[in-house]
Amino acid sequence: MSAVESPVIVTEPGSLKPQGLTQTATGGKFGAAATVKTTPTKAKPYVKPQNANNLQNNFNPRKIFTEYISKEETDAGIEDGSMFKGVLRINPKNYQECFLDHPKGTNHPDVLVLGQDRNRAMQGDVVAVKIKPKEDWLVNYVEYVKWWAEHKKGDRNSGKTDNNSPNKTEKRCLRNEIQDNGVTSDEVPDSCLITIGAIVHILEKKHFRVAAGKLQLMPNSANPNVLFVATDSRVPRILIPKSDVDKEFFSRPKDFERFLYTAKITDWRAESVYADGRLVKLLGMSGEIDTETERIVYEHQIDHREFSDECLESLPITTAENWKVPDAEFEYRRDFRSDIVFTIDPKTARDLDDALHAKHIDDCDGKGTPGLEIGVHIADVTFFLKEGTELDKWASERGNSTYLSQTVIPMLPRILCEQLCSLNPGVDRLSFSTVFKMSYEAELYDVWFGRSVIRSRVKLAYEHAQDFIENPEKDFTCDELPDISDGNTPFEIKEKTLMLHRIAQVLRQKREDSGALRIELPRLKFALDEDKKPQGVSIYEIKDSNKLVEEFMLLANMEVAKKIAENFPEHALLRNHPPPKEKMIKDVAEQCARIGFPLDGRTSGLLSTSLRKYQGKSRLDMCIRQVISSLTIKPMQQAKYFCTFEMPLSFYHHFALNVDHYTHFTSPIRRYPDVIVHRQLAAALGYNERSERVPEEIQEICTRCNDTKLASKEASDESAMLYFGVFIHQTGPMKCQAVVLGVMDLSFDVLIVEYGVVKRVYVDKMKRDFNKSTEKLTIYWPADPNAESGNREEFSSSIQMCNVVYVILVPYKSIEVSATIVRPSLEQRNILKSTLKDMKETGSTILQ
């Protein structure tokens, strides 16, 4: 079932009008308190209008968009190369700009689709695109100027002078250059142009065609519809029939301005700039955490329904109370209950799906060499979750758990993810284990896979493990740690943690030496009060304790991938990561070189080596690292699940990890692909028969899980931005240090150093100059009699990539945050002057 066909979330409208004087929630569906004030109205039942699916408007029937060509024509065009197939990406800051990967590969810039050529397609849709004539392509000004200087300025026959050099208008098509400067289409190389395409057919509607937004009156009172304006600018405005809307909206629309509704697009005709749609329901007051969270969940179609009785009844066990591991399981499972097994997780985690143990052994290689046994124990979810059951279908559709700032929307019922499957301390739990025998230098000699029984001794938080690592000589007491079961001591837990830490460091170094890459982008962490409102915000810091767990999860995933690929070469579910887009990573490298930070992105190893140069702990190093990480992440392609059926071995490669086989095995509580991998590994080991699912079915699951994983990530990111916005609205304007990421003629993008948040700063109301070729923006500050002494006169300041500036974060609208550049102080200007010499010597544009 494709995303757009899914019936899961889009439901028949409920109440579509604000009701009562005051609605107060002490904790809404997503846990945040909300108070909504409205004017009194009487509730009325929803009545479906007879003409709801045949909206007519009074617009000129002239076609605004071109009609789609037939599927047969599309298939033929893709086959003969006159068209190509791609996934549409719409610029969230400018819905008139859309992008697709170039059909000739990643060494070419993206194909650009502009304005009406988008032809009613939406974000994420799989579309057929026809390349427009070369004369309609846009000029890539920077590359074009280089070509002009080399090939036209010295051409005596051209008769051109400096006054005839190319126009600097950013969006200028080749046709203009042909007319104005006498060039021909054939002589201008494609590398100087941006390929322009037009969408001719939608092959798959990946976008759900749903949105959250607000209602507006139509400017034409004779029009029988209401305008729905989505919060996501990439979604078109939607015509809603008047019969869907509370009658009182038309007499007092101002009272409805702050309310958020949800709507579903039913059609988008070629003769209308607006889509047709239906109102689904009233969400609540915009700006309230619970309302905005429901908006996020709805827009990304995250299934947050309570699990049905049929789902729960499909479990072999319906209650967790007094549950014990059946005796029959001990007959074939390896028993690790005598080993000191424990978990390391976030402090608030309740779904504990992985545990570790480590111990010294006398023979790690069969030759009497002392070494280590490391056990990675993963919750045996498939013991409870049987293939083909109602719950299995639900889990497959959800694809994964979704983590929001204040809550988790689980993939599985809480009886599994928090009780029966969670590797809680002090109780016997079923697990699926990978056990490694290795030397103290992390040379791997043997891997054992199998079902097992464990008994975790303690639930450590990352903070506890980090305390052990930072204070190895300290004698920890029981009061400093969570409860430890089975008579083990804090000393024993500490020693096992340090043993794991030492070997994890070696494993990590080996991976980095072999070319593994890690790009760490800042992640926000919020301190919440009892009402789930933000009281503080910081960047989540990845420490050695996090890296400890990560290393052993990676190792287990890699070894399991090899095992299932070997046993099921046509059915294995693996995860690959394509290399970055060649042209984009080359452009990023050139950008970084211009600002004095060499970067080599030809391989993951070379890129990793480049990034490790900026791993220092100073404020300057952190700024550089954040900027370069933000730049290098853009050319990266998404890692994806796939079925190995008829795939070449080269397709298996994981660029970031630089390994040939990788999968996800270690989180079956929160990722459905891990469930499939558990079943495949169990079949490879002879525990059960191989699944009857054919490769095409497995690939369909992979595709769906790729989609749900992306939707969950985007929802999680939006939730973080929601909470950040609420925090700024609570605290008021905030002055922050920021680093410039990119410069345009009317604005520039900055990375807020303290929070890792990217904001756009507009300077369109200031006097300014912009040099496109050097990407340098000069701002002219007017005289200010209220400024500090010595800083009152008019002066200019330059904005280039990697400059450090100060901005004010200001509450904007209901929950949004805008950034405004701060007038540089006299001290900052003096520092700037004193660093100019150093900048010239090093080629760096960092301003401290």
UniProtKB/Swiss-Prot annotation:
Protein's cellular compartments: Cytoplasm; Cytoplasm, P-body
Positions of Mg(2+) binding: D345, D354
Root EC class: hydrolase
Record-level GO cellular component terms: P-body
Site entry: Important for catalytic activity: D353
BP GO terms, sorted: miRNA catabolic process; mRNA catabolic process; nuclear-transcribed mRNA catabolic process; polyuridylation-dependent mRNA catabolic process; regulation of cell fate specification; regulation of development, heterochronic
HAMAP family membership: DIS3L2
Role this protein plays: 3'-5'-exoribonuclease that specifically recognizes RNAs polyuridylated at their 3' end and mediates their degradation. Component of an exosome-independent RNA degradation pathway that mediates degradation of cytoplasmic mRNAs that have been deadenylated and subsequently uridylated at their 3'.
Protein name per the record: DIS3-like exonuclease 2
